[in-house]
């Protein structure tokens, strides 16, 4: 239940309040951070995957509802270790992958989010995958 509350229900509450402020202005951006688990289930991740699927569906519904009113709703997928103190301290072997582009830089994630926010209305993206080149999707093991 906690996973669903943190991933899906919190997204609903946050999105609702953000939309409430943005609607009178006729513009704004709401970004719901997703994960690959929200697009494709995986054994052992039922609670997380279910919650992330719910968040993605919420984002898609809000995009259809709010887009015509000038609010850009997007669902960037962030998949991979992020260069944080938590990763450096608890997963030093993952952190070593930074030298080879195998860990996400928070500044680069921010650049991608800014890109979504500044897109012209005639070319809005809904989903953008952010992952290091060394993720298995690229055939690297």
What are the roles of these predicted feature ranges?
Residues 15-16, 60:
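A short, exposed helix-loop element centered on a Lys and neighboring polar residues
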Residues 3:
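A hydrophobic alpha-helix adjacent to the NAD(P)-binding/active-site core of NAD(P)-dependent oxidoreductases
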Residues 17-26:
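A short helix-coil junction within the Rossmann-fold of NAD(P)-dependent oxidoreductases
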Residues 25, 42-43, 87:
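Conserved catalytic-core motifs of eukaryotic protein kinase domains, centered on the activation segment
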Residues 68-80, 94-138:
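C-terminal helical subdomain
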Residues 29-54, 60, 64-68, 82:
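Catalytic loop of short-chain dehydrogenase/reductase
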């Amino acid at each position: 239940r906690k996973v669903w509350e943190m991933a899906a229900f919190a997204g609903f509450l946050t999105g609702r309040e953000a939309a409430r402020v943005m609607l009178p202005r006729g513009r704004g951006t709401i970004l719901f951070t997703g994960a690959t688990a929200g697009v494709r289930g995986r054994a052992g991740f039922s609670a997380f995957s279910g919650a992330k699927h719910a968040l993605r569906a919420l984002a898609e519904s809000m995009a259809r509802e709010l887009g015509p009113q000038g609010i850009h709703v997007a669902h960037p997928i962030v998949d991979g270790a992020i260069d944080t103190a938590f990763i450096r301290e608890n997963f030093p072997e993952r952190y070593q992958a930074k030298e080879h582009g195998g860990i996400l830089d928070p500044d680069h994630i921010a650049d991608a989010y800014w890109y979504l926010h500044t897109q012209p209305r005639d070319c809005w993206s809904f989903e953008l995958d952010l992952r290091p080149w060394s993720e298995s999707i690229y055939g690297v093991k």
